[in-house]
């Protein structure tokens, strides 16, 4: 009995002790929370706001606030300041709100956000700035928002989006830039760094050209509606291999070029409603293997041969939604019919025509090459390579690609590329093929037996009459070859020229080198001729200067030229002697002005000498006796005779 009482008491104590321990633990937890709250300061809700959920949600909407109110609790996780008159966000305004996750500043009059305005918001997940007056993107204010996932900037008068505008928030997953009606410029690097972005809204931004979206490698949803895209070209969505939803509604699109959607391999939903589309290129949606939702309604579709492939594709891949893709607008007898109801029996269609067929090409190794194949824009183009590979615009090859116009492009040809290449053009009525031979020679060797002829082989395939009543299906193209129902082959010999062996392959490179060599020769010749003319002119100038200097020197030398003086004795007082002297005069002296010389008694008295310059004639310094009459002459008579070399002075 005693043992039973002890067991009962033991169980009773255990039953009482457990609730006591539990209540004690709860009291301690409550005390700790109170102490923590006391240490953090008093948690009071601003008088102009309403708070709930223990101050974690603060709502201050429609209070006419011109600035962020003071005293917002530090444990706030949700702050709504929408529909006020806040004009500026100053730095460190929210510095104490470390737990804030959602900040709503939409529908204010914010014109400026200072750098550091969002400092301290390490936990911020969503930032709403839509319907404000921002003219620039406040990139500097996004610093340190390491957990930001959503950014709303819709309906602001932003004029441009510069490069790296959002690179400070690489964690961003949703970006709303819709209704930027003042937007005029988007930089090529505007979206650099947003490799985590999943959703982008650029609707109603007055965009006329598709911006560069290549950095958005992870983008899954793209809204481009309400813009002005007359055309959608290939490469517009380059790099968006992860895109799943694309909306281009009400954007005035009138033309979508073939291969425009080739890069969108993951696309699931495509909306092209409310545009100006009348037809689509053949097999436009073939690369979109996962496309299950397509909207083409409210477009002026022209139901002719170019629309047959689309009608078949809609019946084949979207059988449950016949009203998704609109009705025929033309011709009149087809107006109002759904696209899925259009069949081939209503039309007489022909196979596509190759307007510019490829031509045989001889080329050296390691060079670029192209084989053209220009076709109607509503047809599809594929190329069959010599090894059996079929390439389209969407195919990937390290060196060979199909351009948008159907041209087969080689970034670098190799010897193994030699062979026949076939361009295969397809529309709903049939196929047309054109082949060309590519001959690749070694860069170091000349190609022997080269011929300049070009052979173009064109094969046209049309649907047989038996196939008209059957449902249209695309003709499969395999590497083993193409099997047409009706085939006509036409070989056109453009030109034939027999050329001897050992003729080098004419190439653009050789022609360029010859042209360059000729230019160098002409340039050198011009330089030589110019130098010759310059030297000739210089020599002529030097000759003229030399002649003038020599003439001036001769004129100056006449002053210092030597003089010859002849002194002749004359006796005018003896007439008899004059007649005798005339008889004895030499026969060489005659004519007007001749002087009759007196008889010379002494031959030694005839003197000829050259006096020094400035000599005086007052006396004779020779010491010889002269005729007595010489001394009776009062003044000497000077006769000067000028010659080229000297001046002779004669004293009479």
Swiss-Prot record:
Transmembrane residue ranges: 527-547
Subcellular location: Membrane; Postsynaptic cell membrane
Ig-like C2-type domain sequence ranges: 352-441
Keyword entries, A-Z: Cell membrane, Disulfide bond, Glycoprotein, Immunoglobulin domain, Leucine-rich repeat, Membrane, Postsynaptic cell membrane, Repeat, Signal, Synapse, Transmembrane, Transmembrane helix
Pfam families: I-set, LRR_8
Sequence ranges assigned to domain LRRCT in this UniProt record: 299-351
Disulfide bonds: 45-51, 49-60, 303-328, 305-349, 373-423
PROSITE patterns listed in its UniProt record: IG_LIKE, LRR
First-listed, main subcellular location of the protein, grouped into a coarse class: membrane
Protein's recorded name: Leucine-rich repeat-containing protein 4
């Amino acid at each position: 009995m005693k043992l039973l009482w002890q067991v009962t008491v033991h169980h009773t104590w255990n039953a009482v002790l457990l609730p006591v321990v539990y209540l004690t633990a709860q009291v301690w937890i409550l005390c700790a929370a109170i102490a923590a709250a006391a240490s953090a300061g008093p948690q009071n809700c601003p008088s102009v706001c309403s708070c709930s959920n223990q101050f974690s949600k603060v709502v201050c909407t429609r209070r006419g606030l011109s600035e962020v109110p003071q005293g917002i609790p530090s444990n706030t996780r949700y702050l709504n300041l929408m529909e006020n008159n806040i004009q500026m966000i100053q730095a460190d305004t929210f510095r104490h709100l470390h737990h804030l996750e959602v900040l709503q500043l939409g529908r204010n009059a914010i014109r400026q956000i200072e750098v550091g305005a969002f400092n301290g918001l390490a936990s911020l997940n969503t930032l709403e700035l839509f319907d404000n007056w921002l003219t620039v993107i406040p990139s500097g204010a996004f610093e340190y928002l390491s957990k930001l996932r959503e950014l709303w900037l819709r309906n602001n008068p932003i004029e441009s989006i510069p490069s790296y505008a959002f690179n400070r928030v690489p964690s961003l997953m949703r970006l709303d830039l819709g209704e930027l009606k003042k937007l005029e410029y988007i930089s090529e690097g505007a979206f650099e760094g947003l490799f985590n972005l999943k959703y982008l809204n650029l609707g109603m931004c007055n965009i006329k050209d598709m911006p560069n979206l290549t950095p958005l490698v992870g983008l899954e949803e793209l809204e481009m509606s309400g813009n002005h895209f007359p055309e959608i070209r290939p490469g517009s969505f380059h790099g968006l291999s992860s895109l799943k939803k694309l909306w281009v509604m009400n954007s005035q699109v009138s033309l979508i070029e073939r291969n425009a959607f080739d890069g969108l391999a993951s696309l699931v939903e495509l909306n092209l409603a409310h545009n100006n589309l009348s037809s689509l290129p053949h097999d436009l949606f073939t690369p979109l293997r996962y496309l299950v939702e397509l909207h083409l309604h409210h477009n002026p579709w022209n139901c002719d041969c170019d629309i047959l492939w689309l009608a078949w594709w809609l019946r084949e891949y979207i059988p449950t939604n016949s009203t998704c893709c609109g009705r025929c607008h033309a011709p009149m007898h087809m107006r109002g019919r759904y696209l899925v109801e259009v069949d081939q029996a209503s039309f007489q269609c022909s196979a596509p025509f190759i307007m510019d067929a490829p031509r045989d090409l001889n080329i050296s190794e390691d060079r670029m090459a192209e084989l053209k194949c220009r076709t109607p824009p509503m047809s599809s183009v594929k190329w069959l390579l010599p090894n059996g590979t079929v390439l389209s615009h969407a195919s990937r090859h390290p060196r060979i690609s199909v351009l948008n116009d159907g041209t087969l492009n080689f970034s670098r040809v190799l010897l193994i590329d030699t062979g026949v290449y076939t361009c295969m053009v397809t529309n709903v009525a049939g196929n047309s093929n054109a082949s060309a031979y590519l001959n690749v020679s070694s860069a170091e060797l000349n190609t022997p037996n080269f011929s300049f002829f070009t052979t173009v082989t064109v094969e046209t395939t049309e649907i047989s009459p038996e196939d008209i009543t059957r449902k249209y299906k695309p003709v499969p193209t395999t590497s083993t070859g193409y099997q047409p129902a009706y085939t006509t082959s036409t070989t056109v010999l453009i030109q034939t020229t027999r050329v001897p062996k050992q003729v080098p392959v004419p190439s653009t490179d050789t022609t360029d080198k010859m042209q360059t060599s000729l230019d160098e020769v002409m340039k050198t010749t011009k330089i030589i001729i110019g130098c010759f003319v310059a030297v000739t002119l210089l020599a002529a100038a030097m000759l003229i200067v030399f002649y003038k200097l020599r003439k001036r020197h001769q004129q100056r030398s006449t002053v210092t030229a030597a003089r010859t003086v002849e002194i002749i004795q004359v006796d005018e007082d003896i007439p008899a002697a004059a007649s005798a002297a005339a008889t004895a005069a030499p026969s060489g002296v005659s004519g007007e002005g001749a002087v009759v010389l007196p008889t010379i008694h002494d031959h030694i008295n005839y003197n000829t000498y050259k006096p020094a310059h400035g000599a005086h004639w007052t006396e004779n310094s020779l010491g010889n006796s002269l005729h007595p009459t010489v001394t009776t002459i009062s003044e000497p008579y000077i006769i000067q005779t000028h010659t080229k070399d000297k001046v002779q002075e004669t004293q009479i």
